[in-house]
Amino acid sequence: LFLKDTFSIAELVIYSIALAVGVIPEAMPLVTTFSLSLGAQKLAKKKVIVKRLSAIEDLGGIQILCTDKTGTITENRLSVVNVFSPNKEETLLYGLMAASSLNGEGTSNNSFDLAIMNAMGSKAKSVVNKIKKINQIPFNPSRRRNSVLIESSYGREIIVRGATEAVLPFTENQYGEDSELARWIVAEGELGRRVIAIAKKRFSKDTYNVSDEESKLVFVGAISFEDPIKSTTKRAIQKARELGVTTKIITGDSAEVAVAVGMKIGIAENTGEVITGEMLFSLLKNEQKEVVKKLNVFARVSPEQKHNLIKLLQEDYEVGFLGEGINDGPALKAAGVSIVVDNASDVSREVADIILLKHDLKVIVDGIEQGRKIFINVTNYVKATLASNFGNFYAMAFVTLIIDYLPMLPIQILLVNLLSDFPMLSIATDNVDRKNILNPKSYDIKELIYLTTILGLVSTVFDFAMFRVFSSYGERTLHTYWFMGSILTELMLIYSIRTKEWFFKIKTLPSKAMLLLTVLASFLTVYIPFTTFGAEVFKFTYPTRDKLLIIFFIVVGYFASTEFVKRIWYRFMNDAH
């Protein structure tokens, strides 16, 4: 145009800037932030606090969800079920005296302590009053036991309590695999019950160390505990499976207990579908990958092994990990999405992306679903805005070269941008068809570029059609009807890209915000050219019925063509995959 001396440099610069503003999806950061904020608000109502907004979208992309079983899969409400001992009362008594977290008032926050206290009833508090705790070595995941040095009416004793394999090897009597105790432990474990062993030792000194608790212990008894599966767990795991997410249990419990729970909730089919952390990491790297892909239950996993297991999974999958202990920090950092419960350690809460106020697997699965909806809506916004903007840009840039006037004035381009942007923003609120969220999603930039380019070319074809029809009527007529056609075709595209199926087959209705804003934008698009304001400020001509009818048929033709091209594209992509 400048070369033809049709316009000054200033006019050309203003037009170019307006055209550039029209083609750039400047609202994308706003749409993304708004979508994520909306998702965070919805999750907050379900007792999920999002620390990192983008974690919601990441949550939607996870393929594997790793969790401990206690408190998430189960109720974390232990009850004593069985006692292996000739003297049940003595075993419970020593089990309670070994409670390292028991305070002077006879209360504790340890679920094992609470279960034993409930089993003992009113006797529990009198036990606490009769003992004097002198020293203790707390429980830790590597030892899998704790011990206390107490003074009571029995004298001064070390009492050791913990996992059976962490206590029994240090007792005076050795219990082999064929012993009655060993068979009892296996039987209880196969029922999903957690078993702890209790042993004691006379001791005269005021202080002791680990070596003192590792010899000449006298076996007192073993207690089995039941932790009921949450009523929501099986449905949550089934829903996760429907979303293409595999749930894996990583626990410090025995293999028997872990796989029994796994079988109850449907992630393991038989007792052989479990492996311990030690067994897993004794394998070669390629064997480890095969095992973690195949199995969903991992038992006797130490904090270090848990970290290595998450890293191993993260190499091939998007992983979400739910942890809570102080030792879970490294594993939480290794996971793509780190999730903790509200009473987790400070270290775990610090590195977490998401905090659960409700200890329930269901809320995590709800979060995955919400993340996928956000991903779909953000992707739909990108498709709609790039396809329509590029389509208009191609057409205007080309037409500008062959006519002696601007196909649309800069102020008209900005009005197109304004009226189409608000409905585009409403995509963030749209309802997503359930069929579209059934698999983990990730951005495919190549597909986005190809699809938006193809849809942009469809838009360009219909822009040329409008130019061909209305350019013969003069400059203002072309401006007016191209303005109308540009906005109305963009609005129709919003509804087309909502689904990969035919538009009329989608069962989920658009959001109220989308319906309201598209109807309002459509009304203003048609109404403004009829007004004096439209004529004076935007230089529109008064529309006529016959030309409005032409615009109507062009818009309908555009929508039908877009639907047809879209279906061919997705069918081609499905065949390619």
Language-model segments: residues:
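Juxtamembrane helix-loop transition segments at the membrane interface in multi-pass membrane proteins
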Residues: I9-L12, T32-S54, L78-V80, L357, ...
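Membrane-interface segments at loop-to-transmembrane junctions
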Residues: S16-A20, K51-L59, K373-A384, L414, ...
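Cytosolic catalytic regions of ATP/NTP-dependent phosphoryl-transfer enzymes
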Residues: D58-F219, F225, Q238-K239, T247, ...
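Hydrophobic alpha-helical transmembrane segments
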Residues: L1-I64, I223, A240, K311, ...
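C-terminal transmembrane module of polytopic membrane proteins
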Residues: M484-H577
